[in-house]
């Protein structure tokens, strides 16, 4: 009983208010720490001053490796860091890593399922040096075409935006690279819901109807055969406007007046030179030199590559692109699709009229020179 009474008294002490005596300070707790001291320096255990902070190149490479992370937020933040690094440095300085090292990590993100990742990817692509990107158009185009035919409508919209950026800085390279003309046109028709009538050995009502509807010289293009999906329901036609705008830019780069590599550009520039007779008897000396404005001037010969079909061929001149554009029925399909879009009116109708103007000017220039007579 004595021990039990003692324990009860000890417990009651916790709830009893101590009586303070006048003139005496309050008792300090057991865990009290005196902080009234003053010191000029604080010494930490295991402190090392030999380690240096990571350089900008190291941080850039680290965030570049994080682009393959499974976390959406990690990929988004890494893209934002890379974009900030590229935009903050002076324009005359090269990026911390070459574009040939940066692009392989960026290309798979064109097909990323996260919208914020794709948006940050487009910002990063626009921050890359334009003259360096032109040499890697052949690597970019397969991923862009894969995104344009993706099942998700949002990925298709983002891929077309990437194509619009690439056409704006390297339009000649986009339409002149292997598969850059025919395959990209097929992707555009797929995105917009315009289809070229396929040639079949079997007679059918649909085939005969589409064939009879096509005009001479315009191929066997058929009209729109299905409602295309342009992303979210609240977009109100804005993706379609962007698609048609980028299609107009793509056609202008390929067959429009801004198209490069006409057949006689090299000869004309050489003949107009004031020093054309300095290398007599060779008056067109520049035409005998290796082109210096191309990274791979003989890539079109495909000397060591696999054989290409008509879709994967390189069409370097404006005339060659116009021939295949008419022969494969793209002209008829695009004209009918633009006519349908023009009937919708509004912004869609205005943009479709611009694309139709590009076709009309190309027809007047090229068919007037006799490039469409033999088809």
From Swiss-Prot:
Classification lineage: Eukaryota, Fungi, Dikarya, Ascomycota, Pezizomycotina
Provenance organism: Emericella nidulans (strain FGSC A4 / ATCC 38163 / CBS 112.46 / NRRL 194 / M139)
GO terms for biological process, alphabetical: rRNA processing
Assembly description: Component of the RIX1 complex, composed of ipi1, rix1/ipi2 and ipi3 in a 1:2:2 stoichiometry. The complex interacts (via rix1) with mdn1 (via its hexameric AAA ATPase ring) and the pre-60S ribosome particles.
Similarity annotation: Belongs to the IPI1/TEX10 family.
Keyword field: Nucleus, Ribosome biogenesis, rRNA processing
Protein name in UniProt: Pre-rRNA-processing protein ipi1
Gene Ontology, cellular component aspect: nucleus; rixosome complex
Pfam families xref list: Ipi1_N
Subcellular localization(s) per the UniProt record: Nucleus
């Amino acid at each position: 009983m004595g021990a039990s009474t003692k324990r009860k008294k000890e417990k009651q002490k916790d709830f009893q208010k101590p009586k303070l005596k006048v003139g005496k300070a309050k008792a300090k707790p057991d865990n009290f720490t005196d902080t009234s001291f003053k010191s000029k320096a604080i010494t930490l255990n295991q402190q090392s001053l030999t380690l240096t902070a990571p350089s900008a190149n190291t941080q850039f490479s680290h965030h570049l490796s994080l682009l393959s992370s499974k976390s959406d937020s990690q990929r988004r933040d890494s893209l934002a860091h890379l974009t900030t690094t590229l935009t903050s440095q002076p324009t005359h300085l090269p990026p911390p890593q070459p574009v040939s090292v940066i692009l392989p990590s960026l290309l798979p993100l064109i097909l990323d399922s996260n919208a914020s990742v794709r948006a940050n990817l487009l910002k990063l692509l626009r921050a890359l040096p334009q003259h360096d990107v032109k040499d890697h158009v052949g690597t970019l185009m397969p991923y862009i075409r894969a995104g344009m035919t993706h099942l998700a409508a949002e990925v298709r919209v983002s891929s077309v935006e990437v194509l619009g950026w690439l056409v704006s800085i390297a339009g000649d390279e986009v339409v002149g690279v292997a598969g850059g003309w025919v395959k990209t046109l097929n992707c555009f028709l797929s995105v917009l819901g315009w289809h070229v009538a396929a040639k079949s050995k079997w007679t059918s009502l649909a085939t005969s109807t589409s064939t009879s509807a096509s005009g001479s010289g315009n191929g066997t293009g058929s009209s729109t055969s299905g409602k295309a999906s342009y992303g979210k329901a609240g977009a109100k036609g804005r993706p379609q406007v962007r698609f048609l705008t980028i299609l107009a830019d793509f056609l202008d780069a390929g067959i429009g007046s801004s198209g490069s590599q006409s057949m006689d550009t090299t000869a004309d520039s050489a003949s107009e030179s004031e020093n054309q007779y300095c290398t007599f008897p060779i008056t067109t000396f520049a035409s005998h030199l290796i082109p210096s404005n191309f990274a791979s001037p003989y890539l079109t010969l495909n000397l060591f590559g696999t054989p290409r079909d008509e879709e994967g061929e390189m069409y370097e001149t404006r005339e060659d692109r116009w021939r295949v554009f008419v022969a494969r029925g793209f002209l008829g399909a695009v004209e009918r699709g633009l006519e349908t879009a023009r009937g919708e009116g509004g912004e869609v109708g205005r943009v479709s009229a611009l694309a139709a103007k590009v076709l009309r000017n190309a027809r007047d220039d090229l068919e007037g020179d006799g490039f469409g007579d033999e088809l």
